[in-house]
């Protein structure tokens, strides 16, 4: 299982802050594409990704037992 944590607007759009996916291995790009399709998360394309509390680059490999945090850009004034 890979644990996915969603923050801010992404969590609101998905209706949850945490999702577990039953996969042994995936890339961060595959996870983002799957969540975009399943939950309609259009803003996920601009989100930062952290795996096990460390920011990673696009298309990083993720394995079962990892935690992936998807953090959208923050705006305000």
Curated annotation (Swiss-Prot):
GO CC field: molybdopterin adenylyltransferase complex
GO function terms (MF aspect): nucleotide binding
Modified residues annotated as 1-thioglycine in this record: 77
Keywords: Molybdenum cofactor biosynthesis, Nucleotide-binding, Phosphoprotein
One Pfam family it belongs to: ThiS
Single GO BP term: Mo-molybdopterin cofactor biosynthetic process
Modified residues (Glycyl adenylate): 77
Pathway info: Cofactor biosynthesis; molybdopterin biosynthesis
Modification after translation (UniProt): C-terminal thiocarboxylation occurs in 2 steps, it is first acyl-adenylated (-COAMP) by MoeB, then thiocarboxylated (-COSH) by IscS.
Listed SUPFAM superfamilies: MoaD/ThiS (SSF54285)
InterPro entries: Beta-grasp_dom_sf, MOCS2A, Mopterin_synth/thiamin_S_b, ThiS/MoaD-like
Function: Involved in sulfur transfer in the conversion of molybdopterin precursor Z to molybdopterin.
Subunit comment: Heterotetramer of 2 MoaD subunits and 2 MoaE subunits. Forms a stable heterotetrameric complex of 2 MoaD and 2 MoeB during adenylation of MoaD by MoeB. During catalysis MoaD shuttles between the two heterotetrameric complexes.
Similarity-based family: Belongs to the MoaD family.
Name of the molecule in the record: Molybdopterin synthase sulfur carrier subunit
Naturally occurring in which organism (per UniProt): Bacillus subtilis (strain 168)
Taxonomic classification: Bacteria, Bacillati, Bacillota, Bacilli, Bacillales
Gene behind the chain: moaD
């Amino acid at each position: 299982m890979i644990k996915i944590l969603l923050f801010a607007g992404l969590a609101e759009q998905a209706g949850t802050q945490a999702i577990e996916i039953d996969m042994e291995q995936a890339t961060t790009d595959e996870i983002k594409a799957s969540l975009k399709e399943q939950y309609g998360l259009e803003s996920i394309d601009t989100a930062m990704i952290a795996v096990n509390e460390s920011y990673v680059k696009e298309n990083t490999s993720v394995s079962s037992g990892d935690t992936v945090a998807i953090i959208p850009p923050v705006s305000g004034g």
